C-alpha cells in the first residue's frame, strides 16, 4: 500500500532542543516577531473562524509593489521549503534531474525523491558553490538547478560575475532558482542582486522566506518571484489554502516594517562579525581546511570534519545546542549579544577539547559585547 521507494527516503533532521540549553541549531531568530508585526498578528486572530484568501491576493500585491514586479510574478507558500518542493513538482517528471551544490540545504534531495526526480549533488569547493562543475553536471534530463546564496550550512556566497558566467552556460529550458533564505544578512557587495538578475534571465526565479530575519518561523511563510508561467505552475501544485490567515497578515505587516527589520538584522550581523573575529583569532590545530568560512548568513560553519560529532557533544556539555553534520562540520546560529557571550565561552572550551584549536589559545574576539552591558 505504501510506495516502496519511500523506505530509502532520507528524513529531514530538524534542530534539536535540550531543556535549559541555548538552542543555536535551527537558524531561528531568538526574538519574537517585530513589534508592529506582533500587534497585527494579535488583531488577526479574531477572524480565524474564516478560511484565508486562497490566492493570498493582498499579500502578493504588497510583495509585488515592494519588489517592483507584476502580481503574476509572485507566489507565496507555506515557507520557502514548500515553494522549493512545488518548484520540483512543477518542473520535473519522473526521472528528471535537479542539480544543486552539496552540502547545501538538506531538504533538496528529499524534495527531489518525493517528486520522483533525481537529485544531482555537486561537491562544494572550499565551502562555496562550484558553479563551473554545476554547469557541467547539467544534462538532457536536467530541469531545475538550485543555487543557495548564501549557502546553508557554510554561509558562503557566489559572486555576480560567477553567477552570470554560470547562467550563460545554462540551457534556456532549465530553470535556475536563487534560494535566498538568508539574503537579509548578506553584506557581500559582489553578490548577485536578485531583482537585477531576474530582468536578465527569463529562466531564473528567486525564493525567499519570512522565517529567519523576520522571526516568523512558526507561521511558515515564503515567497517566490519569477516568470508568470512558472508562478502559475507553482500555484497549480500547491495545497489549497496553504498559507494561513495569520501568516498572510504577518507577511503584509513585515513588508511594511523594514526599518524595524534593518535594526534587528544589523545587530545580528554585528554578532556574526564578533563570532568570526573570535574564530579568526584562535590557532587551528593543523587542519587542512580553515576553521570557518566567511559567512553572509545568521550562522557560522565550523569545519570540524571527522570531529564534528565530538564538537557537537562538547558544545552540549557547555549548554549549547548546535546543528551537527556528521563527518563534515557543525553549524551554529548567531543571535543576540547575550547569547553570543554564552556561545563564545562554550567555544573557548569546546574547540580545544576536541583538538580543533591549540589548547590555551587566546583570541581578541572573546570579549563581552558592549550591547550586553
From Swiss-Prot:
Q: Keyword Transferase, does the record have it? A: yes
Gene Ontology MF term list: aromatic-amino-acid transaminase activity; histidinol-phosphate transaminase activity; pyridoxal phosphate binding
Arranged from A to Z, the UniProt key words for this protein are: Aminotransferase, Pyridoxal phosphate, Transferase
SUPFAM superfamilies of this UniProt entry?
PLP-dependent transferases (SSF53383)
Recorded E.C. number(s)?
2.6.1.57
Q: Where is the signal peptide?
A: none
* Primary role: Aminotransferase that catalyzes the conversion of aromatic amino acids and 2-oxoglutarate into corresponding aromatic oxo acids and L-glutamate.
One Pfam family it belongs to: Aminotran_1_2
Q: Which family does it belong to?
A: Belongs to the class-II pyridoxal-phosphate-dependent aminotransferase family.
Protein name, per record: Aromatic amino acid aminotransferase
* Modified residues annotated as N6-(pyridoxal phosphate)lysine in this record: 212
Broad enzyme group: transferase
Q: In terms of domain of life, where is this protein from? A: Bacteria
GO terms (BP aspect): L-histidine biosynthetic process
Under catalytic activity, the entry for this protein gives: an aromatic L-alpha-amino acid + 2-oxoglutarate = an aromatic oxo-acid + L-glutamate
Task: Tell me the lineage of the source organism.
Answer: Bacteria, Bacillati, Actinomycetota, Actinomycetes, Mycobacteriales
Amino acid at each position: 500500500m505504501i510506495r516502496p521507494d519511500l523506505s530509502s527516503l532520507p528524513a529531514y533532521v530538524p534542530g534539536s532542543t535540550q531543556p535549559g540549553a541555548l538552542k543555536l541549531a535551527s537558524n531561528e531568530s531568538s526574538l519574537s516577531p517585530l513589534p508592529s508585526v506582533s500587534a497585527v498578528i494579535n488583531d488577526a486572530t479574531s477572524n480565524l473562524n474564516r478560511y484565508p484568501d486562497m490566492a493570498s491576493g493582498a499579500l502578493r500585491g504588497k510583495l509585488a509593489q515592494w519588489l517592483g514586479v507584476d502580481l503574476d510574478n509572485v507566489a507565496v507558500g507555506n515557507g520557502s521549503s514548500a515553494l522549493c518542493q512545488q518548484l520540483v513538482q512543477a518542473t520535473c517528471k519522473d526521472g528528471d534531474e535537479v542539480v544543486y551544490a552539496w552540502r547545501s540545504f538538506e531538504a533538496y534531495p528529499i524534495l527531489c525523491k518525493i517528486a520522483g526526480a533525481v537529485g544531482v549533488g555537486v561537491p562544494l569547493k572550499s565551502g562555496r558553490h562550484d558553479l563551473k562543475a554545476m554547469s557541467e553536471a547539467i544534462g538532457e534530463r536536467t530541469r531545475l538547478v538550485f543555487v543557495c546564496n548564501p549557502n546553508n550550512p557554510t554561509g558562503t556566497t557566489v559572486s555576480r560575475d560567477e553567477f552570470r558566467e554560470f547562467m550563460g552556460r545554462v540551457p534556456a529550458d532549465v530553470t535556475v532558482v536563487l534560494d535566498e533564505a538568508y539574503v537579509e544578512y548578506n553584506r557581500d557587495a559582489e553578490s548577485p542582486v536578485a531583482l537585477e538578475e531576474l530582468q536578465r534571465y527569463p529562466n531564473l526565479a528567486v525564493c525567499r522566506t519570512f522565517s529567519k530575519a523576520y522571526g516568523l518561523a512558526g507561521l511558515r511563510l515564503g515567497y517566490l518571484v519569477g516568470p508568470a508561467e512558472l508562478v502559475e505552475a507553482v500555484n497549480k501544485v500547491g495545497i489549497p489554502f496553504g498559507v494561513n490567515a495569520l501568516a498572510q497578515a504577518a507577511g503584509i505587516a513585515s513588508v511594511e516594517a523594514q526599518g524595524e527589520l534593518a535594526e534587528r538584522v544589523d545587530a545580528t550581523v554585528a554578532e556574526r562579525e564578533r563570532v568570526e573575529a573570535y574564530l579568526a583569532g584562535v590557532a587551528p590545530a593543523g587542519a587542512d581546511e580553515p576553521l570557518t568560512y566567511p559567512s553572509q548568513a545568521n550562522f557560522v560553519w565550523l569545519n570540524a570534519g571527522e570531529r564534528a560529532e565530538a564538537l557537537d557533544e562538547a558544545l552540549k556539555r557547555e549548554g549549547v545546542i548546535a546543528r551537527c553534520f556528521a563527518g563534515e562540520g557543525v553549524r551554529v546560529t548567531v543571535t543576540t549579544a547575550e547569547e553570543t557571550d554564552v556561545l563564545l565561552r562554550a567555544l573557548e572550551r569546546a574547540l580545544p577539547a576536541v583538538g580543533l584549536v591549540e589548547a590555551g589559545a587566546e583570541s581578541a574576539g572573546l570579549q563581552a559585547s558592549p550591547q550586553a552591558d
